[in-house]
Amino acid sequence: MKIISCIEELRDHLRGQLRTAFVPTMGNLHDGHLSLMRLARKHGDPVVASIFVNRLQFGPNEDFDKYPRTFQADVEKLEKEGVYILFAPTEKDLYPEPQEFRVRPPDDLGNTLEGEFRPGFFSGVTTVVLKLFSCVQPSVAVFGKKDYQQLMIVRNMSKQFALPTEIIAADTYRAEDGLALSSRNVYLSPAERAEAPALFQSLNSVANEVRSGHLDIFELERKAMADLSQRGWKPDYISIRKQSNLQPPSAGDMAQGEKLVVLAAAKLGVTRLIDNLEI
């Protein structure tokens, strides 16, 4: 595996490749990330991964400097997965001057759910993804469904900017007890780790109610949040949305069988977890 930080060197190595598959990450890799590499290999060759902790997507109350950096361990994992190039730019490589031009997702996608609680987050994400796409110039890029809103926003950005990159969605990789794998899980205490699967269980309960014909969305969301609160969680949201555009479904949408997704974010102790489940 080649490790490259220079954009021009990266382009030289990839020139002439017909179907490069790309997986962007911020490092601190776990089995969920590695499953994205395997899916990428099914859709393209060579596979390029990136590791870059993107300052632009960190808010004023989110500690950029404390984000886990495990570069050498990440390198070993990517080598075992047969990744061809690891693109690992420094901030100076990727942002040689202040990034004055930013991508701004539409408000109805970027300022709801995660965007409401993390202002500017999706602008930071889409700006760095667009820049990474420009560097790698992939035919396909793989994003996990765990970050469902991010997936939708990146997919819409790629479509509206007519980027020659197909966005592939990867199913959420879960532990045996249902907890979605996340770099944040390392912050959970043993007791919190035992409790953490309750978030996915809550999503399943909501989904089962919808499938059984319960159409009062507000009541389902309210009850699910109250149940988590009683267990010691601090939920930011549990919200039922349309898969197509992440807008709240109308009664007509519900009656007509619109494809839905229930999304959640909640704090357990000091650790904020997110998850979702398609219905």
Curated annotation (Swiss-Prot):
It is found in: Cytoplasm. It is an enzyme of class 6 (ligase). Its main location: cytoplasm. ATP binds at residues 26-33, 144-147, 181-184. (R)-pantoate binds at Q57, Q150. The active site is at H33 (proton donor). GO terms for molecular function: ATP binding; pantoate-beta-alanine ligase activity. Beta-alanine binds at Q57. It catalyses: (R)-pantoate + beta-alanine + ATP = (R)-pantothenate + AMP + diphosphate + H(+). One of its GO terms (biological process) is pantothenate biosynthetic process. Homodimer. Belongs to the pantothenate synthetase family. Catalyzes the condensation of pantoate with beta-alanine in an ATP-dependent reaction via a pantoyl-adenylate intermediate. This is Pantothenate synthetase. It comes from Janthinobacterium sp. (strain Marseille).
